[in-house]
Design a protein with these regions (language model features):
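Short, glycine-/Ser/Thr-/acidic-enriched flexible segments
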Residues: 14-17, 25-26, 63-67, 83, ...
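Short, basic, helix/turn surface patches
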Residues: 126-148, 404-413, 698-700
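Structured core elements
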Residues: 8-13, 20, 59, 102, ...
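N-terminal amphipathic, basic-rich helices that act as targeting or association modules
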Residues: 1-64, 70-72, 163-165, 182
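Glycine-rich phosphate/pyrophosphate-binding loops
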Residues: 96-128, 194-208, 379-387
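Extended C-terminal regions of large enzymes
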Residues: 53, 74-76, 151-186, 192-700
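Extended catalytic cores of very large enzyme megasubunits
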Residues: 4, 19-20, 24, 65-72, ...
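Feature captures the catalytic cores and cofactor-binding loops of soluble hydro-lyases/lyases
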Residues: 39-122, 130-133, 137-147
Length: 700
């Protein structure tokens, strides 16, 4: 596999110290990334394995587009067993930054970590030179200091994925950080900690071979000038502008006249109006600090940054000198939930310092710097919602020992004092006291603290599944489509295919026209909170959403931007190009490829995930044992009938029918929701079919 892929799997056994090289071409039908991860986990991790067992694996896998220069392609898929949900099933973390590109430049499609080191180590990779190094001097340090120490020992060009104290202490809600603020969550930090692996440091100098460089450049120019929008591929500006036919205040295309990077080096830089067509100004479109935190963030924003080979630049970079008062660096940044979640625990809001709402900006920079340095992970905000629930409902007063409860500064919490965040995160990362169990995850605290149905059924807490993971663009995002999507994985679904389309900013009429072209009927697309019962077009929409996220996690593209469903250009009638992944695939690998072939590969990967879940759960009955939804989704808004304007609640009978229709569309058993032998064979998964049959896990 000379083009796109490197052809190499690096296997590191921490128990024996053996480091070996394998051929990744044996997994080629699974494309890369997520596909490689699931196949390795299915083959090598038996049912009954626990997350912290030596038998568990940690699989870092990239795809053929990563490292090629394709836009938004620096993603690595990290697959292991969940530390934080019921059943400890297979899950993925999705990490951006520069780690994935450096993996490819060093010559590896996959890194498999197995076993457990006797004492702390870090993995050093410089092209073909790979070694395990002692990490005793790093143990106890945060992710930032660990990265700095390793870069001093190696090179400033080294990319380090490191855990902090949370991972060392096996905190289930922990992750790893690379390139300062780019995280891989889903408990993978604790998996590394359980293996005594402090960090993986990689530097590559080889590059990625591209079959057709001229076509690659043409596709890049085409995407950058005609197709790409802003963060989440929103394709209209958030304010009316001279060049734009449409605008939408919810759009992440936030650039406008009078909006500045207020703390830029050399003086403020105006984002201005950024019409499509000029690829050199795409990076000004998205302004996440103001979008996430409000106008008070403008004067502290240095610039937007982002991942390797990404023009969108969705990562805020801020400089707030006064945060040093709280013992953290004055600079930092992130995007989305990580930008704003930290001050949500304050029942009366954060306390302002000098300007209106600056408490939210300052408090969140303090919070995210601490959170990232400790290597904590918020489970898409669920950690903080669980805190709010337990505080407001008196759970902490009931379950914390009296001495511990008395020593916590609840007065700081009520006052919106940032010092409370410091103490709270320290306790979580160092597992101090009963409160620290909050970071065990929702399922664990519900069991440990006997929270009962009130907890699971509380709408504001946003728990989607009784397995202990939250909503991630679910019933509020295209009704049954988002609801089906949220049922399918073993953590929050991390699927943005459908929400990017919904949030594009285009008017409803245009979106429904596009839906008809893609899914056969305008009825695939409902206006938000004005839903209709399930239909065949919605099922096709749900399947497409899931297959595209699996495809992106296999070729390793960013599903926050891809696919190019719509365009910002009126001259294209705002139509995108859903064959673009296949066009890049062909240009990079040299292999003939179509949209349909890639969709089939994605279906193979998605069905393998389902088979892996069946095997680990040791049950065929996915409908009644896995695809479960918390009661609030059906019981919210009791005064508004379902399928009435003004509510996004779902109907139980309609969701039952939706799942049945979706199972049929996937070729799974329509009652059980598990893959059939026929479908597994159609997808080239004969070995999986034989294994499931041997364990009586195929439907009759």
């Amino acid at each position: 596999m000379a083009n796109g892929w490197t052809g190499n799997i690096l296997r590191v056994n921490l128990t024996t110290g053996n480091i070996t090289l394998e051929d990744s071409s044996k997994f080629k039908s699974f494309v890369g990334g997520m596909g490689f991860g699931y196949k390795i986990m299915y083959d090598e991790v038996p049912p009954g394995t626990k997350p912290f067992d030596e038998a568990n694996k940690l699989v870092f896998a990239t795809g053929p587009l990563t490292g090629s220069g394709a836009p938004c392609s620096s993603r690595v898929n990290i697959t292991s067993l969940s530390t934080f949900t019921k059943g400890n099933l297979v899950v993925d973390a999705h990490m951006g930054g520069f780690f994935a590109a450096q993996m490819k430049f060093a010559g590896y499609d996959v890194i498999i970590i197995e076993g457990k080191a006797k004492s702390p180590v870090w993995l050093k990779i410089k092209d073909d030179k790979v070694s395990l190094e002692k990490a005793d001097f790093l143990w106890g340090k945060g992710t930032r200091a660990t990265t700095e120490e390793i870069c001093r020992l190696t090179s400033p060009e080294t990319c380090v994925a490191a855990i902090g104290q949370a991972g060392e202490n096996l905190v289930p809600l922990s992750g790893m950080l690379n390139s300062r603020n780019h995280s891989g969550g889903a408990g993978t930090g604790a998996i590394m900690g359980s293996k005594n692996l402090k960090a993986i440091a990689v530097e590559g100098t080889k590059g990625v071979n591209i079959a057709d460089r001229q076509e690659m450049k043409r596709l890049n120019d085409y995407m950058m000038t005609e197709l790409i929008g802003a963060n989440n591929n929103h394709v209209v500006p958030s304010t009316p502008q001279s060049w734009a036919e449409y605008s939408d205040p919810k759009s992440r295309w936030t650039a406008r006249k009078g909006l500045f990077w207020g703390a830029a080096e050399g003086g403020p830089i105006e984002t201005g109006e950024i019409p499509p067509g000029n690829q050199n100004t795409v990076g000004f479109r998205t302004y996440k600090s103001v979008f996430d935190l409000g106008p008070a963030a403008e004067k502290y924003t240095v610039k937007m940054s982002g991942c390797h080979s990404c023009p969108i630049r969705c990562m805020t970079q801020m400089n707030i000198p006064r945060v040093k008062e709280f013992g953290v660096p004055s600079t930092g940044g992130n995007t989305c939930v990580a930008n704003f979640v930290h001050t949500t625990i304050f029942p009366n809001g954060p306390k302002d310092f000098e300007d209106k709402d600056d408490g939210r900006v300052i408090g969140n920079l303090v919070g995210l710097n601490l959170f990232d340095d400790y290597g904590l992970w918020c489970n898409y905000g669920q950690l903080h919602r669980d805190f709010t629930y337990c505080y407001s409902k008196g759970v902490f007063k009931r379950v914390l020992p009296a001495e511990e409860y008395a020593e916590i500064h609840w007065d700081q919490l009520e006052a919106g004092d940032v010092n409370f965040i410091k103490d709270f995160y320290y306790r979580l990362a160092h597992r101090v006291g009963e409160l620290s169990h909050l970071a065990d995850g929702s399922y664990a605290i519900a069991e440990r603290w006997n929270l009962g149905e009130e907890y699971w059924g509380y709408a504001k807490n946003k728990l989607w599944s009784p397995f202990g993971y939250p909503v991630h663009h679910a019933n509020e995002a295209s009704a049954q489509v988002g609801s089906i999507v949220n049922c399918m994985f073993n953590r929050d679904c991390m699927t943005h295919t459908h929400i990017n389309f919904i949030g594009s900013g285009l008017p409803l009429k245009l979106q429904r026209e596009v839906a008809k072209e893609l899914f056969g009927s305008e009825d695939a697309y409902d206006e938000t909170k004005n839903y209709t019962p399930i239909n065949d077009a919605k099922i096709k929409y749900a399947k497409w959403s899931l297959l595209r996220v699996c495809l992106h996690n296999a070729v390793t593209l960013c599903n926050w931007v891809w696919p190019m469903t719509v365009s910002p250009l009126k001259s294209r009638n705002y139509r995108g190009d859903l064959a673009l992944e296949a066009k890049f695939f062909k240009a990079i690998t040299g292999e003939e490829m179509t949209q349909e072939k890639l969709d089939l590969a994605a279906e193979r990967i998605f069905t393998l995930h389902r088979a892996c879940t069946v095997k680990l759960m040791q049950t065929k009955d996915m409908r009644n044992e896995h695809d479960l939804i918390c009661s609030w989704v059906f019981d919210k808004d009791p005064q508004i009938p379902v399928f009435t304007e003004g509510t996004d609640k779902m109907d139980r009978d309609d969701m039952h029918a939706s799942l049945t229709m979706f199972y049929k569309e996937m070729g799974w058993d329509p009652q059980l929701g598990c893959p059939t032998r026929e479908t597994l064979q159609r997808l080239g998964l004969e070995d999986i079919a034989a294994d499931l049959a041997a364990h009586n896990l195929l439907p009759v």
